[in-house]
């Protein structure tokens, strides 16, 4: 058996130099180590990485309590993976950034830790991490191709050595190798002795013995089998050659290493496996969010307990910009879809008074008998009435007499238009306070007694507290904005600011609740414009999946906020923004061509939760009853969105969650499992793949919209007591599992 690579932990120094066949990369786990080559000594401290290349002479000198680990790749294995592997030369330089060194160290620490643990997934995980390590070295560690990086001065001798390293287990002869390089046997023998100081046969036997040592150390195979698979004609020939080179018989060599097996580390010294794993964990944590690791396990046990906690669903307020946008059939369809999927029932529109003032002050005489300046407005009102939507209108710059007069004309007309139908739920929203609002609200309430007044609450509003108190009897809600991006100076890229920004929404919510309490203001809150960290550019769209972050914010806000606002779609949103920074203030539900953004599905999944909370922790909530419940699991990792632009560093962090729901009633249950993550339901990844310089045709649009949807799995399961689920969680993903017991027959 020939091993492709070795994974070792060493606590003892080497007494002599060795020449490496293959490639070695490692780091100092603890203490200090001196790494010697032919000409230099490199002092390595804890965490420092070292690389030893093919044919290099090397020796380790460990200081007191020093521990190193390394991965040694056999040349035959490398040759199968890379062209000209024997010429590949890696060297750590200043070009190897700290971030990339952390990544290398992290992969190695995971690899060694996995090897020590030796569970049923270890071999598969080792192979994955080994490939990941090599890929990372190829991408991030500077390399050159040196045809003569070894001590050999003759390229043809070098070729022979490489050939022997790759084919040592075959029947090789001086005649065959001389023909391989185009020399006579005598000339090759002479050059070999001049370059290496040993003859051809001695070099061949030494190479075979070094590989046989690995089999003696790491396998339980019979000595005869080891002899034959390493190129010897018989066990007797192998034994003679082995004793000549090592001064031991193969049996004696194996007997001196009774504690070492293929699945254990050779040099444990005074350190047990658990101690080594704890030491390695310090390095694994450094880049934990950016490394894919199928052995990242999380075991969660849930037993339902009686609780008085309740989960509150939100009233969703959808911004459409100008009221006339409600005449667009595509926008109407989007609103109705939202209404169906998560009970959207309120629309926020911009102020129509400037339009009415312009019509009333037109240079020609308005004739009510032949024209209607409210025609389009009436059509919009009819749509809202037909589908039970309420209308909230933003009043802006309302302090002039002309504005107040136009407002009264508008309100009077709306009251007349809806009087013959069911009542329209009508609200007014103001972002600034002025005394003229008192006159306007009195007129409004006379015609719409059930109408509401929304006041934007911030520090400017607080400075007008006396007027706010006068209006308080008419106020239904206080409205506020909270954009995490406002807490960050993107030009500085300060990670501390990004950490603070991750809590910005909930912190501002708590600040306003405290402000209301101090001034004895008791009204529910609406979070209208809000966003998590995105970066101040459209480039990050789709690169940083945020579903889990958004669901985390919704759960934190559910007991503090009554309403949540969204823009209906990208086109409406961006058309009302002055710049990219302004665009970051809010989130839209639809992209172009009716494509649903992940935030849409986040709202949809959140709406599937019921009010009774059975269990909750930092990453999970269960609602419902013990026979009909919903499990929401999510991952929320807040990090600088610009890191998502580095494709190599933005690897998926995959966690396998083993979830047990205990003490359930025996019976047959139906399971519906929704998965929303970067691979399931993320619009922009598919969008970019199917978008051309000329846009998207209908087939592409239909396909992208059809495929951009959370994954759904449905199945039945017969349970006696415990529901066991295995859930693959990708960074910032969301899983909603609906569990319903069938009635007993």
From Swiss-Prot:
Keyword line: DNA-binding, Repeat, Transcription, Transcription regulation
UniProt entry tagged with the keyword Transcription regulation: yes
Residue ranges of every copy of the HTH araC/xylS-type domain listed in the record: 158-256
Gene3D superfamilies on file: Glycosidases (3.20.20.80), Glycosyl hydrolase domain, family 39 (2.60.40.1500), Homeodomain-like (1.10.10.60)
DNA-binding region: 175-196, 223-246
InterPro entries, sorted: Glycoside_hydrolase_SF (IPR017853), Homeodomain-like_sf (IPR009057), HTH-like (IPR037923), HTH_AraC (IPR018060), Tscrpt_reg_AraC-type_HTH (IPR020449)
GO MF entries: DNA-binding transcription factor activity; sequence-specific DNA binding
NCBIfam families listed in its UniProt record: TF_Staph_AryK
Name of the protein in its database record: Uncharacterized HTH-type transcriptional regulator
Species whose genome carries this gene: Staphylococcus aureus
